[in-house]
Every structure is written in C-alpha cells, then in structure tokens.
A protein has these predicted regions:
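Conserved catalytic cores of phosphodiester-cleaving nucleases, focusing on short active-site segments
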Residues: 30, 53, 73-91, 102
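A short acidic/basic microdomain associated with nuclease active sites
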Residues: 49-65
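Nucleic-acid nuclease catalytic cores
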Residues: 86-130
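Nuclease catalytic cores
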Residues: 12-16, 31-35, 39, 43
Length: 130
C-alpha cells in the first residue's frame, strides 16, 4: 500500500527541518552539480542540526529468507526516513518506484525524493508494512 502527497508537507518538526535543509542547500549551491555534491552538502546541513544521518546505507533484499541483492539508499535520517536524491530534469515514476522498493525492503515507512534539478522538487512516499 502506497500513498503519494507530492506537495503535502507533514507538520512533523523532523520533516520540516529536512525540507528546509533541502531548500537551503539548493538555494545556496544552485543548479548543475553532481548528485554527490548535493548529498555531501545536505549531510553537513543535517548533521549540523543534530540529525543522525547515514549515507549510502546498504539495504538488503530478501526472497524466501535468502539475500538476493542490495540497494544503497542515499541517506537514512534518524533511522526513520529514507532520502533519495536526484539531479534530474523532473522526477519520474521510476524514481518513485526505486524509493518504494527501498521502503519495502526496510522497516522504514516514510521516504522523500529530493530533486536538485533545474527546479527543486520533492515527493513523499509512505509504505505501510501492515
């Protein structure tokens, strides 16, 4: 089960700070850098605000109790939110499915796609494990 609220900003203080950091990094650096540059800047911004940030966190994928592969999430914040960063012209469905698969493979239910493209944009994805 997935739900999509592209422009709905959760009232959560955590999410508010993450999105403010995203826009601060975008507005400071502007458009045109590689994804890694934005990832490093966002990491430093979130660490400075006191968040626990894991970068390129390995997510194992299992099939019938056998490990069949792994993904690497761009960032995991406070063990509760996955951030997937992009530098695309626009977010596409395959970006959304990538994030949904990360959520499926973990106990984390909330993820954000953050696009540092020509125009900053984000999408929130929620995957319920129940």
């Amino acid at each position: 089960l997935t739900r999509d609220w592209s422009s709905d900003v959760c009232s959560s203080d955590l999410v508010d700070k993450i999105l403010k950091a995203f826009y601060l990094v975008y507005n400071t650096l502007g458009y045109g850098f590689l994804e890694r540059v934005y990832q490093n800047a966002l990491y430093f911004e979130l660490i400075e605000q006191g968040f626990k940030c894991e970068v390129q966190k390995q997510i194992n994928v299992f099939y019938k109790n056998h490990k069949v592969g792994e993904y690497y999430a761009d960032m995991v914040i406070n063990n509760s939110i996955i951030l997937e960063l992009k530098t695309a012209d626009a977010l596409r469905p395959e970006h959304e499915f990538q994030l949904i698969n990360y959520l499926k493979a973990t106990n984390i239910e909330i993820g954000y796609l953050l696009n540092f493209g020509k125009h900053p944009e984000f999408k929130r994805k929620i995957f319920s494990h129940h």
